[in-house]
A protein has these predicted regions:
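Canonical phosphoinositide-binding patch of PH/PH-like domains
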Residues: 75-83
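GIY-YIG nuclease catalytic motif and its immediate N-terminal context
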Residues: 1-55, 83-98, 102
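A broadly used, surface-exposed interaction patch
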Residues: 52-73
Length: 109
């Protein structure tokens, strides 16, 4: 469990081993930080169904990989938002992006 922007996220999980749940919510793509057990967010996104969202096909995947060096250094953390609307998830994503200013998010506010 990790807290980002006041929200509890499950994980971080190694991206290659992550089994995406059939749930909606927010996600953070992360790499290990400089200190033990710390992580740095590269990207925040939202999905109507995590299980339908293959992050290896994301347009920014190659950039994330260039930072991580290998997919074994890419992690994902998720915050499930059952019964959420796309607009609600997008607003939450914008808030996280404005707070953290990750390198590869489109909405840097």
């Amino acid at each position: 469990m990790i807290t980002l922007g006041g929200r509890s996220f499950g994980g971080p999980f190694l991206l290659p081993l992550w089994s995406a749940p059939a749930a909606s919510g927010l996600y953070a793509v992360m790499v290990p930080g400089w200190r033990l057990l710390t992580f740095r967010a590269l990207y925040f996104g939202q999905a109507g169904d995590f299980s339908q969202n293959d992050l290896r096909r994301h347009p920014r995947y190659a950039e994330w990989l260039s930072i991580g060096g290998t997919d074994w250094n890419l992690y994902i953390a998720t915050h499930e938002m059952p019964f959420s609307t796309e607009a609600g998830r997008q607003a939450a994503e914008r808030n996280l992006t404005c707070s953290y200013r990750p390198e590869f998010s489109e909405n840097k506010g």
